[in-house]
Curated annotation (Swiss-Prot):
UniProt key word Transmembrane helix: no
Name the UniProt record assigns to this protein: B3 domain-containing protein Os11g0156000
Organism: Oryza sativa subsp. japonica (Rice)
Protein localization: Nucleus
PANTHER family in the cross-refs: B3 DOMAIN-CONTAINING PROTEIN OS11G0156000, B3 DOMAIN-CONTAINING TRANSCRIPTION FACTOR ABI3
GO molecular function: DNA binding; DNA-binding transcription factor activity
Source organism superkingdom: Eukaryota
Broad class of the protein's primary localization: nucleus
SMART domains: B3 (SM01019)
Length: 279
């Protein structure tokens, strides 16, 4: 028998169109999510010898309407699932004497098995039914001490700050006037790098002084502990003989050099003592 329906024609595969399949998949996930209905803190009478749970009227009429007829007179059997997936069946009815909606048959067994006490909380959830299937009902409970913990949000995780790098300076603040004199141009650097560069420059500067000391100056008779020896400085490829300088002036010059070097590369070069006029 030939099939003239476009879904079963020879030109197309015998399957649902892509759009229909995507809609069915979305419809399935949309209708199978748990919806929180309400919760009820248990009173001493809810867990006492009356063997019944009073459901607040506004929640009972909204989620478990009895309607009219035999359901209103005799009640209904409501089926639930607990957290472990175990089934629970309760008789649900309306008591005209107290004008309240209650769960009666099956409730006492639930209280005993879950070991519920006054102050504990029972909560109800559902999954909306679709395609002619009724709602799936769920029941759960939590202890009285867990109620505050469930409502209190967890504190945010602590943020661990990485320790500062070693030899990063005495916590110098960032300054846009820190430059590096290495390379062809002047680029901003961090204070830690600038501090390390100043220490390296000062160390190299001191080594250059000691390396260029003439042996004949240190071994000469005129050399003594009380008098400062003359030193030879090699600057820009030229050997220069430098006379003794007061120690205070040397410290001041080194301090000025470090400060000016932190400001800019040009200022660092201008802070170096010039000996061209003495040669």
């Amino acid at each position: 028998m030939a099939m003239n329906h476009p879904l079963f024609s020879q030109e197309q595969p015998q399957s649902w169109p892509w759009g229909v399949a995507m809609y069915a998949n979305f419809h399935y996930h949309h209708h199978y999510e748990k919806e929180h209905m309400f919760e009820k803190p248990l009173t001493p009478s809810d867990v006492g010898k009356l063997n019944r749970l009073v459901i607040p009227k506004q929640h009972a009429e909204r989620y478990f309407p009895l309607g009219a007829g035999d359901a209103a007179d005799k009640g209904l059997i409501l089926s639930f699932e607990d957290e472990a997936g175990a089934p629970w069946r309760f008789r649900y009815s309306y008591w005209t004497s107290s004008q309240s909606y209650v769960l009666t048959k099956g409730w006492s067994r639930y209280v005993k098995e879950k070991r519920l006490d006054a102050g504990d909380v029972v909560h109800f959830e559902r999954v909306r039914g679709s395609f002619g299937v009724g709602d799936r009902l769920f029941i759960g409970c939590r202890r009285r001490g867990d109620a505050a913990a469930a409502q209190t949000p967890a504190p945010p995780p602590a943020v661990r700050v990485a320790p500062a790098a070693q030899n990063a300076g005495e916590q110098q603040p960032w300054s846009p006037m820190c430059y590096s004199t290495s390379g062809g141009g002047s680029y901003p650097t961090s204070p830690a790098n600038s501090y390390a560069y100043r220490r390296a420059a000062d160390h190299d500067h001191g080594d250059m002084h000691h390396a260029d000391e003439s042996p004949r100056d240190t071994d000469s008779p005129s050399f003594s502990a009380g008098s400062a020896p003359s030193r030879r400085l090699r600057l820009f490829g030229v050997n220069l003989d430098c006379g003794p300088e007061p120690e205070a002036d040397t410290t001041a010059a080194a301090t000025m050099y470090g400060y000016m070097h932190q400001q800019s590369s040009y200022a660092a070069m201008s802070a170096v003592p010039s000996y061209w006029g003495n040669s």
